[in-house]
From Swiss-Prot:
H(+)-stimulated, divalent metal cation uptake system. This is Divalent metal cation transporter MntH. HAMAP family: NRAMP. GO terms for molecular function: cadmium ion transmembrane transporter activity; manganese ion transmembrane transporter activity; metal ion binding; oxidoreductase activity; symporter activity. It comes from Mycobacterium bovis (strain ATCC BAA-935 / AF2122/97).
């Protein structure tokens, strides 16, 4: 007969909720083979099997500046990716530093990583504790020369000095034949089959998971005293259950750890009293401006060339009639974007990852196919918009303009890939401001009548054509690729904080981020319609974007027309790079595939160049691209509302019931409007 204790003993331990970061300090850039990756795969594989969420990064792939300040761009360096990488460090309960031996010592990359960790060691968290408090650290070393223990002890000393908790047996390594002997993954090395290395790696991995789980446990669940010896009941207890020597040793160890935890808690709770000696993270976060950015990248999708076509057509044909649609669409979009960012912050997963996790492989492939088609249709529209702007400004052939747009957008993506998300956000935000200036500059010449503007806020239609344009505005505003992307942007920028003050703060900042970004995007969309209503109403040559440019030129002058074209160009360039970024995130989240950005750029550029070369009407193509986008809206918005309203997914941060109901209303309404757009377009 199997007892309950036997069943518990047989069940493998689970460490769900823990997150680990492995930093590989190899000197080889990706995709070169790193032998250290072999040991990382063994340890991280064990963690994944037991429920730990694992993140890995190769430090040499990133532009980490030399120095001992949190952000070296504030101390003379042009670029520094460490602030973005540091968020991944803070997101992890377990940090494992891994690297090779060089001349009997750690690599220069390892030393740089430790220096930058040291640079942030005086920062405090929201509870006034030092940043690395309550986290576990370990290391993995590979090489074919003496020094594995020397390197490991240097790393472990550094980690404990910085504030990490180091469990017993917190290191593992493999050392091959000294000299030019084989390295860990070389054929015949015996590295992956080495019992000693595998055993130590397993010990290290489980010790890290156990200590990290204990450090995260609520205080009430931690042991506070050693059990009294058998036969000697402690005060207030009935006679205790007899314990074995191994159980006593285990309890003593847990008690010692708990005592260390209480001592550290007492000391670190006084962190606010030693503010003069340490830089509080709240010093750099005392204003929320530092944390703004992800929503501004997502907002580019709301001012792309498709929006220009829909808004200008609406204003030229119906004046101020459909202004209310723009306002309503942006309010709905703000809710959708906030829910997307919230999902990324709370779960640590992008929307594609969260959806894919709940699907089998055939369903994931089908879902990925529709999402990628939508992302590619978006990218085609953005390239065409940029090509139109270049033809307006420089009289370039449309195919040449498309190539230039594709190349420039690739350069923007390179900024994100090489220089980090923060700089990418700054560049995209700058382009958003250029777009805003380009489409609002006309108000310095002629302002719309206030009464007419207020009249446009009253919901109403004038015939079937106005309904079609309203659906087009809605379809051009709530963009599926922006919904997918924003969840990943928020996670990558802010990390995945544990429940508590830090998460609440980041959610508040996210609401500000979304609110400000959507206010700018909504203002730009409204400006497009108002400019068209004021200057193009009744003209017969505004059916295309180029016709709208000429109308602006004739009514407002060359300067305003040039600014209009510059705004359109910035819209095409920025939205094209953001669309390609979203496509990569969709593929990574659903299929766990990564395609080089250049290859992806060429794939999506091909259809756009073919359309431009074959002489299809560019503006008509933009309209049709919005129809393709309409197919993807329900697949993005409906799962988002379901996931963020699920306590199983969001825990204590699940949507309020009212928010969920409003979310469902918005999701269904947007989906129905897009179905209507498809129907009206197909039926003419």
């Amino acid at each position: 007969m199997t007892t309950t204790s036997d069943q518990n003993a047989a069940a493998p331990p689970r460490f769900d909720g823990l997150r680990a970061l492995f930093i590989n300090a190899t000197l080889k850039r990706s995709p070169e083979l790193s032998h250290t990756d072999g040991l990382i795969e063994r340890s991280s594989g064990i963690m994944r099997e037991h429920g730990v969420q694992v993140d890995t990064l190769r430090a040499v792939d990133h532009d980490i500046a030399t120095g001992v300040w949190p952000d070296m761009t504030e101390h003379g360096w042009a670029t520094d990716e460490w602030p973005a990488l540091y968020r991944r460090v803070l997101d992890a309960h377990i940090l494992v530093l891994c690297g090779p031996i060089w001349l009997g010592d750690n690599s220069s990359v390892m030393k740089r990583v430790i220096e930058r960790l040291y640079a942030c060691s005086s920062l405090l968290n929201e509870d006034g504790q030092y940043a690395y408090y309550g986290r576990a650290g370990g290391c993995l070393i590979t090489g074919n020369e003496d020094g594995v223990k020397h390197c490991a002890m240097n790393v472990l000393y550094s980690l404990q000095h910085l504030g990490y908790t180091i469990p017993p047996q917190a290191d593992a390594g493999w050392i091959g034949e000294a000299g030019p002997g084989p390295s860990y993954l070389d054929p015949g090395s015996g590295g992956p089959e080495n019992d000693f290395t595998n055993r130590n790696t397993t010990f290290m991995t489980f010790n890290l998971m156990h200590i990290a789980q204990m450090l995260r446990a609520p205080a009430a669940s931690r042991p506070t005293a050693i059990n009294a010896p058998s036969g000697t009941p402690a005060a207030g207890r009935t006679s205790p259950t007899p314990t074995t020597d191994s159980q006593r040793r285990s309890r003593v160890a847990r008690w010692l750890v708990a005592g260390e935890f209480r001592l550290l808690s007492h000391l670190c709770s006084r962190g606010s009293k030693v503010g003069e000696l340490a830089q509080d993270t709240r010093t750099s976060l005392k204003t929320s401006w530092y944390l703004l950015g992800p929503a501004f990248v997502a907002a580019i999708a709301y001012v792309d060339p498709g929006n220009v076509a829909a808004n200008v057509s609406s204003g030229a044909q119906f004046g101020y009639l459909l202004l209310w649609v723009i306002v309503a669409a942006n309010v709905m979009a703000a809710l959708v974007q906030y829910l997307s960012a919230k999902l990324g912050l709370v779960t640590g997963r992008s929307l594609p990852e969260a959806i894919g996790k709940r699907m089998g492989r055939p369903a994931r492939l089908a879902y990925w196919a529709q999402a990628e088609i939508v992302a590619m249709a978006t990218d085609v529209a953005e390239v065409i918009g940029g090509a139109i702007a270049l033809r307006i400004m420089f009289n370039l052939p449309l195919p040449i303009g498309g190539i230039i747009t594709g190349v420039v957008s690739l350069l923007l993506l390179t900024i994100q890939d090489r220089r980090g998300q923060r700089l990418f956000e700054r560049v995209i935000t700058a382009l958003l401001l250029v777009i805003a200036i380009g489409f609002t500059a006309s108000f310095f010449v002629v302002t719309p009548p206030p009464n007419a503007v207020l009249g446009g806020l009253a919901p109403r239609f004038q015939g079937t054509e106005s309904v079609l344009l309203a659906a087009a505005i809605m379809g051009a505003t709530v963009m599926p690729h922006a919904v997918y992307l924003h969840s990943g942007l928020a996670r990558d920028r802010h990390g995945h904080p544990d429940p508590g003050p830090q998460r609440r703060r980041l959610l508040r900042v996210t609401r500000w981020d979304v609110g400000l970004a959507m206010l700018i995007a909504g203002g730009v969309n409204a400006a497009m319609l108002l400019v068209a209503a004021l200057n193009m109403r009744g003209r017969g040559d505004t059916a295309s974007i180029e016709g709208a440019y000429h109308a602006v030129h004739d009514t407002l002058g060359a300067t305003i027309a040039v600014l209009f074209a510059v705004g359109l160009l910035a819209s095409g360039l920025a939205s094209s790079s953001v669309g390609a970024y979203a496509g990569a995130m969709i593929m990574q989240g659903l299929l766990h595939w990564s395609v080089p950005m250049l290859v992806r750029r060429l794939i999506t550029l091909g259809p756009a160049l073919a359309i431009l070369t074959l002489g299809f009407d560019p503006t008509r193509t933009l309209v049709l691209s919005q129809v393709v986008l309409s197919f993807g809206i329900p697949f993005a918005v409906l799962p988002l509302v379901k996931l963020t309203g699920s306590p199983a997914v969001m825990g204590g941060d699940t949507n309020h019931r009212a928010t969920t109901w409003v979310g469902w209303v918005v999701a269904v309404m947007v989906s129905l409007l897009n179905v209507m757009l498809i129907y009206l377009t197909v039926t003419g």
